[in-house]
């Protein structure tokens, strides 16, 4: 015969609902992969993603121009979304740290659309647009995995890097002496990008910033060399 400890007597029903509820509440929530979640969200939406050339530095203006044309030309049934991918980074200027939004793809915007003659013309003739990436008459849609890499917020994939930056900031705020960084990179050197949207791509160093431990490299994106800023830890020597 089964026995019970405490005040519960044998034969008396034991209500486990409360105990089970407590266990469910105490169980840690399953972590959601932000990349998988974003990919599932994008897959559920209509249209394909296309990359559009724009004048560097005018990406946001081109985005606004295109969104206005979508309304004026009544092509909202074909052109659904326009994005200028950005990432939040920490910059040091005049000895002060500040968070800034930096464009992931300088000189490009992303457009989610159904490709028709009308939608193609609406995008192609937008002021500031210089063309689609891909064939002139039939642009190539961007793979969904690439869209996720460009649109996923930086913090979702680089928590370790963010933690390292926070540690450095705390050390600086506490008056601790920062270690001397030995720079092992030089302008013109070829490296491989190891992290972020351009992981595995080769790049050429164009600038070295020892104080901020950052590099400016040239990466071939859609057939055009584009400057990208990376930390020392985001590249590897070839």
From Swiss-Prot:
SUPFAM superfamilies: N-utilization substance G protein NusG, N-terminal domain, Translation proteins SH3-like domain. Transmembrane segments: none annotated. Does not interact with Rho. InterPro entries: NGN, NGN-like_dom, NGN_dom_sf, NusG-like, Rib_uL2_dom2, Transcrpt_antiterm_NusG, Transcrpt_antiterm_NusG_bac_CS, Translation_prot_SH3-like_sf. Coiled coil: none annotated. The keyword tRNA-binding does not apply. Pfam families: NusG (PF02357). Participates in transcription elongation, termination and antitermination. GO terms for biological process: DNA-templated transcription termination; regulation of DNA-templated transcription elongation; transcription antitermination; transcription elongation-coupled chromatin remodeling. It comes from the Bacteria. One of its GO terms (cellular component) is plasma membrane. Keywords: Transcription, Transcription antitermination, Transcription regulation, Transcription termination. This is Transcription termination/antitermination protein NusG. Belongs to the NusG family. The lineage of its organism: Bacteria, Bacillati, Actinomycetota, Actinomycetes, Mycobacteriales. HAMAP family: NusG. It comes from Mycobacterium tuberculosis (strain ATCC 25618 / H37Rv). The keyword Transcription applies.
């Amino acid at each position: 015969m089964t026995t019970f400890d405490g005040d519960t007597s044998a034969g008396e029903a034991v209500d486990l609902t409360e105990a089970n509820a407590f266990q469910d509440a105490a169980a840690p929530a399953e972590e959601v992969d932000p990349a998988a979640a974003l990919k599932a969200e994008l897959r559920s939406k209509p249209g394909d993603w296309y990359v559009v050339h724009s004048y560097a530095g005018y990406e946001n203006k081109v985005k606004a121009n295109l969104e206005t044309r979508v309304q004026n030309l009544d092509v909202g049934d074909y052109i659904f979304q326009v994005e200028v991918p950005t990432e939040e980074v920490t910059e040091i200027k005049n000895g002060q740290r500040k968070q800034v939004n930096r464009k992931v793809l300088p000189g490009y915007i992303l457009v989610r659309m159904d490709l028709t003659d009308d939608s193609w013309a609406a995008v192609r003739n937008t002021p500031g647009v210089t063309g689609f990436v891909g064939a002139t008459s039939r642009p190539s849609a961007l793979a969904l995995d690439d869209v996720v890499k460009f649109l996923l917020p930086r913090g979702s994939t680089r928590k370790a890097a963010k933690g390292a930056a926070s540690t450095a900031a705390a050390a600086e705020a506490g008056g601790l002496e920062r270690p001397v960084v030995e720079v092992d990179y030089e302008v013109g050197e070829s490296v491989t990008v190891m992290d972020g949207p351009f992981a595995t791509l080769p790049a050429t160093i164009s600038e070295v910033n020892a104080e901020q431990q950052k590099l400016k490299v040239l990466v071939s994106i859609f057939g055009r060399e584009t400057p990208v800023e990376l930390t020392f830890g985001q590249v590897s020597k070839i």
